[in-house]
Amino acid sequence: MMHKPLFAAALALLPLAAQAQTAALPTDPAADWSVATSEHRIAVEGGKVWVRVNGVIGQGETPVILIHGGPGGTHLGFGTLLSLADQRPVILYDQLDSGMSDHPGDPANWKPARFVAELEAIRKALGVERWHVIGHSWGSALALEYAAAYPEHTASAVLSGTFLSTSHWITGTNLLIRDLPDDVAATIRACEGPTPPAIEVCEPATAAFYDAYNGRPDRPAPTSVMLAYRQRYGGKGFNPELYNTMWGPTEFRASGSLAGYDVSGLLARVDGAKVMFVIGQYDEARIDTVQDFLALTPGAELAVVPGGSHAFIAERPEVAEAIFRDWMNRKDAAAPGH
């Protein structure tokens, strides 16, 4: 799932299920995409969400909306993907109770179905007929739920850093812990036990797990533009109460409302040719788990970002943007009437 907001994006390509050709980089890589064409506050169940658009709806190629992780994260992790707006409108938003959106703080709103309905409310308010939905981590589950519920409005669905099943995720996490050095793995297990050691003992072991699988230490440092953007548009930032209520206090076990969550069965209900899975080479979303999901989705594709973890969008920004750009261009070209 997600712990720290990620600001940048990533691109490195190692397709497994199908060949994906690397697309050209943006025509103007120096452009300041941090300036939105328009900003909106859109009414949804429970309050209003903040939405920004780069580009003009109805102009260019099919729009794309980017769905952040968490639960409780923000749009900041998609910063460099705004360069996709040289071809199509790019829509970013903060889910209710996160970032720049309203924070009613009502747990009654913290249900997957409401988050999916939130997406549809945004689509209607912006006047979008069809769009690509790219969801990362928790956002990938929302992207799949949306694509299954609204196929007529979904040009494609990208399930990035794929999370579709809590039980699969926890199983994968336990296997990843086993791959850490023995002393680190033993400390994490002790910290998750009935009588955990002091926090000073647990924090370094948890950090070692995150460095390996959730945000590798060699990722690029945020630029001054990114830091300025975060200061201006970070809002209230990550919402730990929302995360803890839906997931739990640690990455290693789910004790919240998502404990029994599993939407992998929806893969059989969507058009596999419109689905792509994307993960990092060292992703917390393990490749064998995602290959199982791929097998349930005939016609879907899988791309792996070399050197990337769950935060591959921040770690390999140039490779990730090309993956998403090429995918959407190919799906647009294959669409009837294009």
Short names for language-model regions:
Residues T27-K48:
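N-terminal cap/lid segment of alpha/beta-hydrolase-fold proteins
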Residues G46-H103:
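Conserved HGGG/HGGXW glycine-rich cap/lid loop of the alpha/beta-hydrolase fold
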Residues Q95-W138:
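Active-site loop/oxyanion-hole signature of alpha/beta-hydrolase fold enzymes
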Residues E129-L175:
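Conserved hydrolase catalytic core segment
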Residues A157-E200:
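Flexible "cap/lid" loop of the alpha/beta hydrolase fold
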Residues A186-A268, G272-M276:
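Alpha/beta-hydrolase
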Residues G260, S264-G307:
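Conserved loop-alpha-helix segment in the C-terminal half of the alpha/beta-hydrolase fold
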Residues G299-H338:
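Catalytic active-site module of serine/aspartate enzymes centered on a nucleophile-bearing elbow/loop
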